[in-house]
From Swiss-Prot:
Role summary: Catalyzes 2 different reactions between oxygen and the acireductone 1,2-dihydroxy-3-keto-5-methylthiopentene (DHK-MTPene) depending upon the metal bound in the active site. Fe-containing acireductone dioxygenase (Fe-ARD) produces formate and 2-keto-4-methylthiobutyrate (KMTB), the alpha-ketoacid precursor of methionine in the methionine recycle pathway. Ni-containing acireductone dioxygenase (Ni-ARD) produces methylthiopropionate, carbon monoxide and formate, and does not lie on the methionine recycle pathway.
Pfam families: ARD
Organism of this sequence: Bacillus cereus (strain ZK / E33L)
Gene name per UniProt: mtnD
Lineage: Bacteria, Bacillati, Bacillota, Bacilli, Bacillales
Annotated site residues (Important to generate the dianion) in this chain: 107
InterPro entries named in the record: ARD, ARD_bac, RmlC-like_jellyroll, RmlC_Cupin_sf
Matches recorded under Gene3D superfamilies: Jelly Rolls
Keyword Protein transport found: no
UniProt protein name: Acireductone dioxygenase
Family matches, as PANTHER family: ACIREDUCTONE DIOXYGENASE (PTHR23418:SF0)
Keywords: Amino-acid biosynthesis, Dioxygenase, Iron, Metal-binding, Methionine biosynthesis, Nickel, Oxidoreductase
GO terms (BP aspect): L-methionine salvage from methylthioadenosine; L-methionine salvage from S-adenosylmethionine
Length: 170
């Protein structure tokens, strides 16, 4: 279950109902998908082949189709980041630059952990700490950035409004 940390006051929201309510009030789509469907050989696997990535997409194809039909998404892929990723530190520096997109940014966490820091409606930032099974959609035009948690590894399904993906605006 995702958890929230509000930057300015460093308070946390950890209760499932309260997390869902907070995100809904901020216009952030949050869903919990059944991660137990993932085959054991793909669980916590950060060295994915193209075949592994295709298998992950197939496992969650119904959920991807459902959210895509509801929200107009047209493309998806799988990304894997870990200490074995070439230039991981450079990538993280780039990901941690505050930006926005003209469409929403959707991630489903398959393995590992990630953090989206999002500017709230009141202008203050909050972290959404994500774990396997969490799907989040950062609203279009919301200032945000992404980073990894201390384990420095994540496998995520990215879902896009257009087949070209998204373009960050810094």
């Amino acid at each position: 279950m995702a958890q929230i940390r509000i930057h300015e006051v460093n308070t946390r929201i950890e209760n499932e109902v309260e997390v869902s309510k907070f995100l809904q009030e901020e216009g952030v789509l949050y869903e919990k998908w059944n991660i137990s469907k993932l085959p054991p050989h793909l669980n916590e696997n950060y060295s994915l082949t193209d075949e592994n990535k295709a298998e992950i997409l197939a496992v969650f194809s119904k959920e991807i189709a459902d959210v895509s039909a509801r929200r107009g998404y047209k493309a998806h892929d799988v990304i894997s980041l870990s200490n074995s990723t070439p230039n991981l530190d450079e990538l993280l520096i780039n990901f941690q630059k505050e930006h926005h997109h003209t469409d929403d940014e959707v991630r489903f966490i398959v393995s590992g952990h990630g953090i989206f820091a999002i500017e709230g409606k009141d202008g203050t930032f909050f972290d959404v700490e994500l774990e396997p099974g969490d799907l989040i959609s950062v609203p279009e035009n919301a200032r945000h950035y992404f980073t990894l948690q201390d384990d420095r590894q994540v496998v995520a399904i990215r879902i896009f409004v257009t087949t070209e993906g998204w373009v960050p605006i810094y």
